């Protein structure tokens, strides 16, 4: 979450009159994250999150994102629910941006994920994948292998200002991934951005999954690889095998990974590293002046990419022939 677009108090108060969620008491921007503008609202009826969708989110995709949250909640996955305005719509426009209001989930995201958190997110991810099987809408992933070259093009000429040799590293890896990317693994609804700051816990209990603007249809094990990168590495960018094993075991109890998925995992993890390396690099080079946002370090994912390049099998992640 972040704030790129400011909203005036009187403009927000008028906007809220189109909803039945009470009168505005206070609001504040949320600086965490890098994609959309988010505000915590307190009204006479409770607390809510207001999201103004920025750059990478197309308005035509909002029915998918918001509909998916409702679909998952109906099937026992705890995630925010969009509020409908008085016209019955789940999104409209505010400050020149598509905007939606969702209910506030209790909990905190884990600043230093422990083994119990990794197990919790593994189980929740698998249950989300299962719950999404009958979701009727389909959205292709614009940030999968077919979209990485265009992202690279936005940063190629300045990549070496971030780290010497980065442009060549990315070019070589992208060529390899384009040739090797699998096309025959199980697909379905994925979250595609399930980082620690998008998962809430109350104590050790997972209380909700949030932030669905990257959800789409893609390889399920690719979503697993994204979480491996996000949850199971330490601050020095080394893999914590104990965390990885807990994550995979919990996922596998709900949805066992096939041998083909396990075999492809190192490749998928390289792709997951490239995806976030590229988007972080583009963001790092293009943060708007004065934006209330903290760009994330792209070099974290250079180190993770190099780790996965040296991996020979899923056993290097702490799992055997089956999860």
UniProtKB/Swiss-Prot annotation:
Q: Does the keyword Cell wall biogenesis/degradation apply?
A: no
- Keyword ATP-binding in record: yes
State the Gene Ontology terms under molecular function: ATP binding; homoserine kinase activity
Q: Which reaction does it catalyse?
A: L-homoserine + ATP = O-phospho-L-homoserine + ADP + H(+)
Q: What is its EC number?
A: 2.7.1.39
InterPro entries given in the database record: Aminoglycoside_PTrfase, Homoserine_kinase_II, Kinase-like_dom_sf, Pseudomonas-type_ThrB
- What is the top EC class of this enzyme, as a single word? transferase
Highest taxon of the lineage: Bacteria
Q: Which UniProt keywords apply?
A: Amino-acid biosynthesis, ATP-binding, Kinase, Nucleotide-binding, Threonine biosynthesis, Transferase
* Biochemical pathway: Amino-acid biosynthesis; L-threonine biosynthesis; L-threonine from L-aspartate: step 4/5
Task: Set out the biological process GO terms recorded for this chain's protein.
Answer: threonine biosynthetic process
Q: Which NCBIfam families match?
A: PRK05231.1, thrB_alt
Which family is this sequence assigned to?
A: Belongs to the pseudomonas-type ThrB family.
Its recorded name reads Homoserine kinase
Gene name, please? thrB
């Amino acid at each position: 979450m972040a704030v790129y677009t400011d909203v005036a108090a009187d403009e927000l108060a008028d906007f809220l009159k189109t909803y039945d969620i009470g009168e505005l008491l206070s609001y504040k921007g949320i600086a965490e994250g890098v994609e959309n503008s988010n505000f915590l609202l307190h009204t006479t009826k409770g607390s809510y999150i207001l999201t103004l969708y920025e750059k990478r989110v197309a308005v035509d995709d909002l029915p998918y994102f918001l509909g998916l949250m409702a679909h998952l909640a109906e099937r026992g996955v705890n995630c925010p629910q969009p509020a409908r305005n008085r016209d019955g719509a789940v999104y409209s426009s505010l400050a020149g941006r598509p905007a939606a209001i969702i209910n506030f989930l209790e909990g905190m995201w884990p600043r230093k994920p422990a083994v119990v958190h990794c197990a919790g997110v593994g189980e929740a991810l698998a249950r989300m994948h299962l719950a999404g099987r009958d979701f009727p809408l389909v959205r292709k992933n614009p940030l999968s292998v077919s979209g990485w070259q265009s992202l690279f093009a936005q940063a190629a000429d300045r990549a070496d200002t971030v780290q010497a040799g980065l442009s060549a590293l990315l070019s070589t890896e992208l060529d390899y991934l384009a040739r090797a990317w699998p096309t025959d693994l199980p697909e379905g609804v994925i979250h595609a951005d399930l980082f620690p700051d998008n998962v809430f816990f109350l104590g050790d209990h997972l209380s909700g999954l949030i932030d669905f603007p990257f959800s789409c249809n893609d390889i399920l094990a690719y979503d697993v690889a994204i979480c491996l990168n996000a949850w199971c590495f330490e601050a020095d960018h080394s893999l914590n095998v104990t965390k990885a094993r807990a994550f995979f075991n919990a996922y596998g109890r709900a949805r066992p990974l096939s041998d083909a998925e396990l075999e492809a995992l190192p490749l998928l993890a390289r792709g997951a590293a490239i995806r976030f390396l590229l988007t972080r690099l583009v963001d790092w080079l293009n943060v708007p002046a004065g934006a209330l946002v903290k760009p994330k370090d792209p070099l974290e994912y250079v180190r993770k990419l190099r780790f996965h390049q040296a991996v020979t099998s899923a056993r290097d992640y702490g799992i055997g022939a089956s999860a």
